């Protein structure tokens, strides 16, 4: 269980606790409720995953479908933002008393605007054109978060797109 931690590890040193996918294992992952949960604990660092829907909306989601988190078989790349409320990511959390829809990136950024560290993992895409499109949209939405956001990806196409645009964001 994650607990509030306000004290340095040793004199002169401190530890940064980063909420992986929000509070994965403690709250429905990659949800506004999960991000609020870590914020309530005093955690001000988070990692989450970003994907782009067919209508170009950027969403927070690790998997490319809704099966594991909502129990519904649907490829997210076939969805538009209007369909997101149909997928409750808290369905497997009997003690969680709130519906957790798939959040848009801009909703998430509004909630975590006071965080010190925001690690945005861009999931793999099929083509360089898709990489260019998602990174352009991502950089536009992350404006104002240059001091706290780091864009990460295991996909070399994403890194190439960021390099070619001379991105000002830290990368990993």
Residues covered by each model-derived region:
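Phosphate-group recognition and catalysis centered on beta-loop-alpha active-site segments
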Residues: 1-172
